[in-house]
Amino acid sequence: MRLILLGPPGAGKGTQAQILVEKLHIPQLSTGDMLRAAVKAETEIGKKAKAVMDAGELVSDAIVNAIVAERIDQPDCANGFILDGYPRTLAQADAVEAMLGERGLKLDAVIELVVDDKALVGRIMKRAEDAQAAGQPVRRDDNPEVFEERLREYYKKTAPLVGYYYAKGLLKGVDGMASIDEVTRQIEGILAKA
């Protein structure tokens, strides 16, 4: 099972990815984690990424795509994987299709967690309040201004992927405002038909 989880920040992609990892026994692939692992392992592409990050620049699509391609060749991805936070752009979506095609693979599903923006802001504020109450640090991106900027960035760059995957017949939406268990049930129903 090879799938992508789409949705704005705070929609619950990470939460659902962790649940699916347990249920499907396939890894969650996060580009941030993959970049850090490639840098730590000092792979050729990891060295390139480190040089860019050390210079304080954003890692290019070419480097991110190469790291994803390297990662999906690992044995634990043989039965599939969950892409969370990637692809973020149409160019990256094209790269995913190309890298899978080169391996004779395809995506099984693209699941969009559909949420209400106002409710998302409330969800993020609650997450920050809960962290403070528990004496835990508040995530930098749980600040309303930072979050709203991330939301704008999502709609500008990532939201076009919804149309891209819809046109390919891969996109399925779930009610991301439902309870965690209900969202999981909806996703499982989609995957059973994939």
UniProtKB/Swiss-Prot annotation:
The keyword Kinase is annotated on this UniProt entry: yes
Subcellular localization: Cytoplasm
Coiled-coil intervals, chain numbering: none
Pathway: Purine metabolism; AMP biosynthesis via salvage pathway; AMP from ADP: step 1/1
Catalytic activity: AMP + ATP = 2 ADP
Alphabetically ordered keywords of this record: ATP-binding, Cytoplasm, Kinase, Nucleotide biosynthesis, Nucleotide-binding, Transferase
One Pfam match: ADK
Residues holding AMP: 31, 36, 57-59, 85-88, 92, 139, 150
Annotated binding of ATP, by residue: 10-15, 127, 178
Class in the EC hierarchy, top level: transferase
Cellular component, GO, one term: cytoplasm
CDD domains noted in UniProt: ADK (cd01428)
NMP: region residues: 30-59
GO biological process: AMP salvage
PROSITE patterns with a match to the protein in the record: ADENYLATE_KINASE
UniProt region (LID), positions on chain: 126-142
EC number: 2.7.4.3
GO MF term list: adenylate kinase activity; ATP binding
Superkingdom as given in the UniProt entry: Bacteria
Job description of the protein: Catalyzes the reversible transfer of the terminal phosphate group between ATP and AMP. Plays an important role in cellular energy homeostasis and in adenine nucleotide metabolism.
Domain notes for this protein: Consists of three domains, a large central CORE domain and two small peripheral domains, NMPbind and LID, which undergo movements during catalysis. The LID domain closes over the site of phosphoryl transfer upon ATP binding. Assembling and dissambling the active center during each catalytic cycle provides an effective means to prevent ATP hydrolysis.
Family: Belongs to the adenylate kinase family.
Quaternary structure note: Monomer.
Name of the protein in its database record: Adenylate kinase
